[in-house]
């Protein structure tokens, strides 16, 4: 099993926000996690929220193996085996029916992937979420053109030096993308380490 120290640090703060969007009275909340990474997040969320039925996904083979290992280690009956998913491809290739998901989770992908991935994520969410469903993202964001603190500015420069197509997105650009996909930015939640959860809801 792969271990990311950042995932260990942020899994509890993210969970405290996420649980507000998983109705405890609902028998089953079906969710897709895009870019699941090591599998630490989906395992943590599934153990804490037994009515959350998660489908993790990744493109990297080592990550896919790690996710499967976490599922086995914790004997998670509410997590499916991970799917190989390229979020930059059309939502029709993702293997879900339109309006079939109540929640899509995406943690720490948007700033470290090409714009086609973020655009694909929002287009997919617009088609696959049920009306009233939530796209839940986490990471660093600038707000109305302002990126703070300096550590996030430095991080953004570091990302762009590795790949000019990478970098921190502005919330207004994501809001415009959401609007074009039939969603709206409902809430921003500040979390530790200068990151935020953004909650987009499908109309």
UniProtKB/Swiss-Prot annotation:
Q: Which family does it belong to?
A: Belongs to the UPF0585 family.
InterPro entries assigned to the protein according to its UniProt record, in alphabetical order: DUF938, SAM-dependent_MTases_sf
Q: Name one Pfam family in it.
A: DUF938
This protein's source sits in the domain of life called Eukaryota
Q: Which gene encodes it?
A: mettl26
Name of the protein: Methyltransferase-like 26
């Amino acid at each position: 099993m792969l271990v990311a120290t950042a995932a260990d640090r942020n899994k509890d703060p993210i969970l405290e926000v996420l649980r507000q969007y998983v109705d405890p009275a609902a028998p089953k909340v079906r969710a897709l996690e895009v870019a699941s990474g090591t599998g630490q997040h989906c395992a943590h969320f599934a153990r804490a929220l037994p009515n959350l039925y998660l489908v993790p996904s990744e493109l990297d083979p080592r990550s896919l193996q790690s996710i499967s290992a976490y599922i086995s280690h914790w004997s998670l009956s509410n997590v499916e085996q991970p799917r190989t998913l390229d979020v930059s491809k059309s939502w029709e290739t993702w293997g879900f029916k339109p309006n079939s998901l109540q929640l899509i989770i995406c943690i720490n992908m948007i700033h470290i992937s090409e714009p086609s991935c973020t655009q694909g994520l929002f287009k997919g969410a617009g088609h696959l979420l049920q009306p009233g469903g939530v796209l839940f993202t986490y990471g660093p964001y600038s707000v109305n053109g302002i990126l703070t603190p300096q550590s996030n500015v430095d991080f953004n420069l570091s990302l762009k030096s590795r790949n000019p197509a990478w970098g921190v997105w502005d919330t207004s650009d994501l809001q415009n993308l959401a609007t074009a996909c039939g969603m709206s930015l409902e809430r921003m939640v500040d979390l530790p380490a200068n990151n935020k959860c953004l909650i987009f809801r499908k109309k």
